[in-house]
Amino acid sequence: MSAVDAAAGAADGAHLAAGTVVGVVGPTAAGKSALSVALAHALDGEVVNADSMQLYRGLDIGTAKLTTDERAGVPHHLLDIWPVTEPASVAEYQRLARAAVDDILARGRVPLLVGGSGLYLRAVLERFEFPGTDPVLRQRLEAELAQAGPAALHERLRAVDPDAAANILPGNGRRIVRALEVVELTGAPFTAALPDPSPYYRSVQVGVDLDTARLDERIALRVDRMWADGLVAETRLLADQGLAEGRTASRALGYQQVLRFLAGELTESEAYQETIRATRRFVRRQRSWFRRDPRITWLDSAGSGLVAEALRVVRPAAR
């Protein structure tokens, strides 16, 4: 953060309305974490993690989780809360995140909800009721998944709910099964269960991004740094803790590819290159999700005075 940004933060922070949640969103490698720390200092805030993979203990290098020093004294909530064997639950995350937000607000501070997992952010900020589950139906669908594979079930989902199919990867069997379960239970599309646009909290959202060529370059540099920092060794350690059996954590970018290398399915060079390619594909999907939300004000993370610009967005919107 520049001296100009720091001065702007000190001047602007006091104008934030009480009870407002600040969202900092955007694609992987765009600069959300650094901006959130600077904003937290300017606004007397605390960060609530909304990155689905940073919820897992030990997934540090591959998720670019900030170190204690990089957090610069800013409290961070909902990091390292689950073992790598725990399946992700948006409903459980919603409960934990709202409890953290409420606690921060009760202490008169500003919650900053920060991450690139769009559904997690919306589940906190908006009114979202989770459909129930049926163990018998779930067991049947999971048996079909094991027999026919995710691609076949994805085609079935495409026939009954094309919008959901467009937002779920053909290889993500767990989410495909859940979507089909909701369709059968409710008789309505899975997308009908997405958060209602009505707000749960008063909020203002800032998105950070930069042009594709520069972001692609950042991604390549980030993956190079991950390898240099010991991603392979970290994945080996996590494999001993059951990472490969973790239905969610095993799909984390970088870890998924290194697990395939450790299993002999890829060379290390292939795992490295595939991590870059997979991250770039993931960024395209993140952009598609976030760009549909007109409430997000987008800023160029490569621009000068980013923190001051973000505060100029936050201040009037939060009054």
Swiss-Prot record:
Substrate binds at T28, A29, A30, G31, K32, S33. One of its GO terms (biological process) is tRNA modification. It is an enzyme of class 2 (transferase). Keywords: ATP-binding, Magnesium, Nucleotide-binding, Transferase, tRNA processing. One of its GO terms (molecular function) is tRNA dimethylallyltransferase activity. The record marks S117, R138 as: Interaction with substrate tRNA. ATP binds at G26, P27, T28, A29, A30, G31, K32, S33. Pfam families: IPPT. It catalyses: adenosine(37) in tRNA + dimethylallyl diphosphate = N(6)-dimethylallyladenosine(37) in tRNA + diphosphate. Its EC number is 2.5.1.75. Its cofactor is Mg(2+). SUPFAM superfamilies: P-loop containing nucleoside triphosphate hydrolases. Gene3D superfamilies: 1.10.20.140, P-loop containing nucleotide triphosphate hydrolases. InterPro entries: Dimethylallyltransferase (IPR039657), IPT (IPR018022), P-loop_NTPase (IPR027417). Residues 51-54 are annotated as: Interaction with substrate tRNA. PANTHER family: TRNA DIMETHYLALLYLTRANSFERASE. Belongs to the IPP transferase family. Monomer. Catalyzes the transfer of a dimethylallyl group onto the adenine at position 37 in tRNAs that read codons beginning with uridine, leading to the formation of N6-(dimethylallyl)adenosine (i(6)A). This is tRNA dimethylallyltransferase.
